[in-house]
Regions:
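Anionic-ligand binding patches
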Residues: 2-5, 11-206
Length: 206
């Protein structure tokens, strides 16, 4: 069975990763950061989601000596010129909570009629410290006037995806795991790995 490291300590993301890999769980074992010796992820110095994801995936795969994937994701708001973007997790400061970040976002959007936004996720797959492939997923929607729902994390309570009348925070994991930006990027990652597994007796990325 192939072991792949999910290079994140965010348990919400780990749950989404495990759900995405369920169709091939008989062939893939997801290893988490809790399963390996302590490892400090590199500082995110990239200018894009893709660059940050690849930095983390390369470092994790080299450290653990196994294939690893990492994601970088965030919210891009049209009226804020794409902010918070790659700074989504640090939008209200290093020690801010999800509620702090949401509050700042809503303040920044006060009086702005355009509330269009999109979630973006880039997932990078690396092996032995080298890039293998990146995958990108997006979901468009609008920022609501106030938070709603207790599911999910991050900006989920104020993001209403197109085609729905409720926020990600209200829709719950079953729907979010099917339509979210991360779900769409994960779908591509899983399909790529499945294709590689099906085409090779002894799976290698090289």
């Amino acid at each position: 069975m192939l072991q792949i490291l999910a290079a994140t300590s965010n348990q919400h993301k780990v749950a989404e990763f495990r759900s995405a890999f369920a169709p091939i769980e008989d062939k893939i074992q997801i290893i988490t950061m809790n399963d390996i010796p302590p490892f400090s992820m590199p500082e995110e110095t990239g200018s894009t989601f893709e660059e940050n994801a690849m930095q983390k995936a390369r470092s994790a795969s080299a450290f653990a000596d196994m294939p690893a994937f990492a994601d970088d994701s965030g919210l891009e708001v049209e009226a804020l010129d794409g902010a918070p973007g790659i700074f989504s997790a640090r939008y209200a400061g290093e020690n801010a909570t999800d509620a702090d970040r949401i509050a700042k976002l809503l303040r920044e959007l006060e009086g702005k009629p355009n509330r269009r936004a999109r979630f973006v996720c880039s997932i990078a797959l690396a092996y032995r410290g080298a890039e293998v492939k990146t995958f990108r997923g997006e979901v468009a929607g609008e920022i609501m006037l106030q938070p709603a729902g207790s599911h999910g994390f991050g900006y989920d309570p104020v993001f209403r995806p197109d085609g729905y009348d409720r926020s990600f925070g209200e829709l719950g994991a079953e729907i979010k795991d099917r339509i979210s930006h991360r779900a769409r990027a994960l779908e591509q990652l899983v399909a790529f790995i499945k294709q590689e597994l099906d085409s090779m007796d002894d799976f290698e990325f090289e």
